[in-house]
């Protein structure tokens, strides 16, 4: 079955959305201007929350608006949680949670994480940070495992789709360093294969959110422990 460039264009819309988000994330002038309006102790928190909301808007809402407003029927979004999603999520979580806890101890890791740099957290901020991770990753996985994988399957087939997606996924991690970039390759392949079997984005989203939450909890713990040891 052949599809027109018009029908495939949400792929380009999604990629443009990601680039808009990335530009915003890495624009130091915007970040400095934003932080000037906030107290130094809270500026990191609010900046990160803003970037995550923007990411969801660019990677999910923008492509969805394009799909629905222009009636591109090929891009029907009907992701339903399945039993297979539950099974794969539990298996991967059991493997990745302890690995994440161990990895969070590393000094190189603590240079990057946790993303929000605050000495004092209250319960609302702590939980909201976890929730905003979920919002961000829902948009992220809608783009990467939805549009940029399930969306290109009809065009190129399974194995080329896995390769294309894995390359794009690795490129999206380049700014986080060599270790995360290399680590994204096997994870990306596994998530693509599972996504192809379930035909949903939910395992990828759930696993990614579990990993992010686990990483935040342990990175914050080890960072605070390191700070206390330096006193």
Question: Where does each model-flagged region fall?
Answer:
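Hydrophobic alpha-helical transmembrane segments
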Residues: 8, 12, 86-91, 127-130, ...
